[in-house]
């Protein structure tokens, strides 16, 4: 089945219609009904509850969550994909029990209004807000960010209403079922990867700001510096040799770890910065990308404990940094990667024109 273009999806969102967006098979492998929150009516809530049957949620920007004074449901996010649920909400006025389609639509409208105030909603309630990552799908390739992107691109406030599509037997609908669902209900359907690719053509959140040679103990690298215009973080890329889009490039996307990179503590199965640079130097070409996100204190403490106990703590994938790293790699001309990492799942990196052809384990 031919998928719809992003332009077609945006136009339907602009008209107050619902669309379906699918993510990658190696992530949630699900499809969500998505629409702009400002256009949501009782009939849309009823359709989602009756036909899609997933959890009806309301993605919104961090700024709107702060405006409505919505704290995160859990101070430390332990979910597999980093979905940021806030406390649930209800409209302060105009609702009864809060669960009916009309009541939930009223709550969505109260929270999405351009002049919304914290006093317009109460907690708990029957609508579940999700805080989107600043930068949208260029920062995190999730349905939360996709809903806010589509609403913004269609001229609405960056907030939406989403609901996962489930099969009649309660299992999650995959691509074949989602395409059949879209055809049955005359709903346009697309992918998050296509949305990312569309945004990459028209906008980006990471800009190159400087480039200079770097003479290191492991060879003569080229240092390219980038700034994230959304978060303000500075990222650095160490490149060596010629980067060819048609040939796999040896790549390390590295988060600094004081134990591993400064104190040189051995951590089996993990690449140190020095080891990654040495591997690129030995190969004669490649990229070591240093992401400028600060070290999480809890993660650092966990690594200290694992060093003392000779155990290994699994560090969760930080999906919010995948977008920044992908933009930088694409800017450097990387397309195919031999990634210095244990096998990991990345959602919709094909939208950045990137492909992992091999995972290279640490020695």
Q: Where are the regions that the model predicts?
A:
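Catalytic domains of riboflavin
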Residues: 1-363
